[in-house]
């Protein structure tokens, strides 16, 4: 979902969204005058037509009323209390998950028991269109909205697959780059 004050939308690659040319999704649209409703297999998006940015007053995303679909309702700004959390950037100074007497502040991750994920890509840098791509600022920095909403129920593999369609495949180093790993928890004897 995108909002731009000048009506020009960003289709270039960002640090998160490498691929903006994803496969088409089956959907139906209903224009009800002041509102528009877009229904897919996974969600129903209800948008109240307005001149301002997307917000809790003009956007509601719900689950379709279908057997086997985990029910949810989401509005912008709503906190996901069932998020499974993500990763932490550094463990320097931590003892387990504690830094002194403070627990580690872990940001929301991609997966949630709520069955949905909201990703705000509005502040990420874009890649320019040069042969040797470099980062560039957005035209409407701080004013435009570039959001992704994924509804997947408890099919976490589908969530990961869908995310890699947008973000690109994750590069993994080859196994040989890790060298020889061997570990056991008891002490070695002289004979070993």
Predicted regions and their residues:
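A low-complexity, Ser/Thr/Gly/Pro-enriched, surface-exposed linker/loop concept
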Residues: 1-33
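Conserved, well-structured core segments
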Residues: 180
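Short, acidic/polar
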Residues: 188-192
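Catalytic and substrate-binding clefts that recognize carbohydrates or anionic sugar/phosphate headgroups
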Residues: 29-175, 183-185
């Amino acid at each position: 979902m995108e909002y731009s004050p000048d009506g020009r939308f960003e289709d270039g690659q960002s640090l998160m969204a490498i691929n903006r040319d994803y496969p088409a999704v089956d959907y139906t649209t209903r224009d009800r005058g002041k509102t528009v409703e877009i229904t897919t297999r996974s969600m129903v998006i209800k948008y109240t037509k307005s001149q301002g940015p997307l917000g809790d007053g003009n956007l509601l995303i719900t689950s379709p009323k279908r057997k086997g679909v985990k029910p949810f309702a989401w509005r912008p700004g709503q906190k996901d209390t069932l998020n499974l959390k993500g990763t932490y950037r550094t463990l320097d100074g931590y003892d387990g998950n504690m830094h002194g007497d403070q627990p580690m502040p872990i940001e929301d991750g991609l997966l949630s028991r709520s069955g949905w994920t909201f990703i705000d890509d509005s502040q990420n840098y874009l890649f320019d269109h040069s042969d040797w791509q470099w980062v560039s600022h957005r035209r409407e920095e701080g004013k435009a909205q570039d959001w992704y909403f994924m509804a997947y129920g408890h099919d976490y593999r589908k969530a990961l697959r869908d995310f890699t369609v947008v973000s690109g495949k994750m590069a993994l180093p080859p196994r040989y780059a890790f060298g020889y790993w061997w570990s056991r928890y008891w002490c070695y004897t002289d004979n070993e």
